[in-house]
Design a protein with these regions (language model features):
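A contiguous, mid-protein "functional segment" used to position or interact
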Residues: 131-167
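C-terminal, low-complexity/hydrophilic appendages and adjacent surface loops
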Residues: 57-128, 158, 164-170, 178-191
């Protein structure tokens, strides 16, 4: 597919199975993901109908799960005790500067988000509360839950453990590389 853009849904976990197929290597039993080798022969091939993503910690605790189909993206935020943006999880960038300049740090996020990626590729309008999208929302919730059960996602059992060796910013911290020990969760380390 030299010089072409391929729009197939793929995830990082799909890279290893793809390499195994391309190199004609046996895939280990424990391997997650689906090979997308077929798209190199047929750019219209769609090896999967949805992909999944998760975050637990970046620089602060912010457990998120997501399922993305060709058209829709469903996001579930699991830390209901903190509904603001976790700005320490946002790298220094023009986007973060914009948030800070416009006092968007206090903006809240919904526990669930649903976006129509065809009509809203910038994900500006959350459709999770729109009655017209409830069937789609329920379908994506079920896809995510089925995936979480199959992969034994620990978030299904409550807040995730923070180990003492983790260096984790407090949720209200603005700068991930802060030198102030007060900006770090006391359950982990700060240096």
């Amino acid at each position: 597919a030299n010089g072409q853009v391929i729009d197939a849904l793929v995830s990082h976990v799909d890279v290893m199975p793809t390499l195994c197929d391309l190199l004609q290597l046996e895939k280990p039993d424990y391997l997650e993901g689906t090979s997308f080798a077929e798209v190199f022969e047929d750019i219209s091939a769609e090896p999967v109908s949805e992909i999944f993503a998760e975050v637990n910690f970046h620089t602060s605790y912010e457990p998120i799960r997501c399922v993305r189909t060709r058209r829709y993206k469903y996001i579930r935020y699991y830390d209901e005790s903190w509904t603001k943006l976790n700005l320490s999880n946002m790298d220094s960038s023009a986007s973060k500067d914009f948030y800070m300049r416009n006092d968007l740090a206090a903006q809240t996020k919904d526990t669930e988000a649903l976006y129509d990626c065809y009509y809203d590729p910038d994900e500006r309008k959350n459709l999770a509360q729109d009655p017209r999208y409830q069937e789609i929302l329920e379908d994506l919730r079920e896809k995510l839950r089925t995936f979480q059960i199959r992969t034994q996602d620990p978030i299904l059992h409550g807040e995730l453990e923070m180990k003492s060796e983790y260096k984790v910013n407090k949720k209200e911290c603005l700068n991930a590389s802060s030198k102030d020990p007060q900006d770090y969760d006391p359950r982990g380390r700060w240096q």
